[in-house]
Amino acid sequence: MPPHSFPKAVILSLCLAGPALATPCSDTGGQYESWKPLMAEEAQAAGVGRRGIEALMATSYSKATIGADRNQKSFRYSLEKFMQVRGADAIISQGRKRKAQNADFYAAIEAQYGVPAGVLLAIHGMETGFGNFMGDTNVVSAIATLSYDCRRSDFFTPHLIAALKLIDMGAISPQTVGAKHGELGHTQFLPGNALTYGVDGNGDGQLDLTDFVDAMASTANFLRQKGWRPGAGYQPGEPNFAVIEEWNAATVYQQAIAIMAARIDG
């Protein structure tokens, strides 16, 4: 009888006992259900609790995530085309309005973290249209699928462990939705970055990246912790441009953020 034919409670008890196994990846969805108990052992050994393990066992293989992972066309565009496709002019226009409407808030963020409003607004606009669309894919299933898939398993498995720990903490739920690669909230944090750099910006005692204040504080904290130098430039060749590279590895994305941020702040 395959592992996924056992009652859920039996699988969970097996996952919470014994040493972790090396968890094999696969390029098709056929072995996903058999993979989950093995991944659960690895997660438990990494410190994931019962709530996180239960969430992992409830996931399903996400064909939508695999499709998106194989079809990231926009990062292959020229800078001009990329900015056109991603709506740079609208982001700049909206960014200026939002900065003016929330001047004290962005000034306080910059005073605390050293990151200017334009950078945060450019990222916010680029990632989710200023929170208008934060995704429609189950986060845990998306990240688990990418951990299971051989293409980038080593990269995504730590993010899966982090997502399960976020569930243990109550920062997300098993039903939380995000982008196709499991990114979370207003600025689309991967779970590992959310766990490491997330900030309870509004002081309610809970990290929630779908909350605007938490998301902006967390984004600024990420950049500062990655080496952002307050007052230094962020255009190509300037000290803080390398920190934008930490946010997204695509050159056109980095260049677009730098251009939009300067125009928002200008």
Label the predicted regions:
Residues 1-10:
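Bacterial N-terminal signal peptides that target proteins for export
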